[in-house]
Design a protein with these regions (language model features):
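Nucleic-acid substrate recognition interfaces
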Residues: 1-150
Length: 150
C-alpha cells in the first residue's frame, strides 16, 4: 500500500467565459498582442544567448529566465509601461518552461519553442492578478495606463 505524497498541492483554476464590450475587447487584444511581442522578443534573445554560449563555450553566458527577463526589462520602451508588467514576466516564465520541457529527455514529444504569429487562430495572455468581483473581471492596471476608470 503506497502512501500519498504530502508535497502534492492542488492548483485552483477558474475558467470563465467573457462577454467583453468594445473597450474591454480592445484592452484584451492589446494584452494578447503584448504577450506575443514579449514571447517573440524573449525567444530571439534566448536563441542569441544560446548561440553565444555555444560559440564561446562559456557556461556562464547560457540563457536563463532571469537573464532574459532582466534584459527585456532593461530594454523596455515607453509604450510598454502602459501595459501590465506581469504579462512580460509570465511570458518569459512560460518560455523558460517550454525550453526545460524541450531539453527534458523524459518528454520526447516536446518540440523547440517557436515564434508566435498574429495569424494564429488562438490568441491569449496570462495573468495571476485578475479578480472577479460582482460578475465583472478586474485586471491589474499599470500606473501609467491609458485605460483609466471613468
Amino acid at each position: 500500500m503506497s502512501m500519498p505524497n504530502p508535497k502534492k498541492t492542488a492548483v485552483r483554476v477558474q475558467k470563465v467565459r467573457l462577454y467583453p464590450d468594445s473597450e474591454m475587447k480592445q484592452v484584451l487584444d492589446e494584452l494578447c498582442d503584448y504577450r506575443r511581442y514579449c514571447w517573440n522578443e524573449a525567444l530571439a534573445l534566448w536563441n542569441d544567448m544560446h548561440e553565444q554560449s555555444l560559440i564561446l563555450d562559456d557556461r556562464k553566458s547560457r540563457p536563463s529566465e532571469y537573464k532574459v527577463r532582466n534584459e527585456l526589462v532593461a530594454e523596455k520602451q515607453d509604450w510598454q509601461y502602459a501595459l501590465s508588467a506581469r504579462v512580460l514576466q509570465l511570458s518569459v516564465s512560460d518560455l523558460n518552461k517550454a525550453f526545460r520541457n524541450f531539453f527534458d529527455n523524459a518528454q520526447t514529444d516536446w518540440g523547440k519553442p517557436k515564434f508566435k504569429s498574429k495569424k494564429a487562430p488562438r490568441q491569449g495572455f496570462k495573468t495571476d492578478r485578475a479578480r472577479i468581483v460582482n460578475g465583472k473581471l478586474l485586471l491589474d492596471r499599470p500606473h501609467e495606463s491609458r485605460h483609466k476608470k471613468k
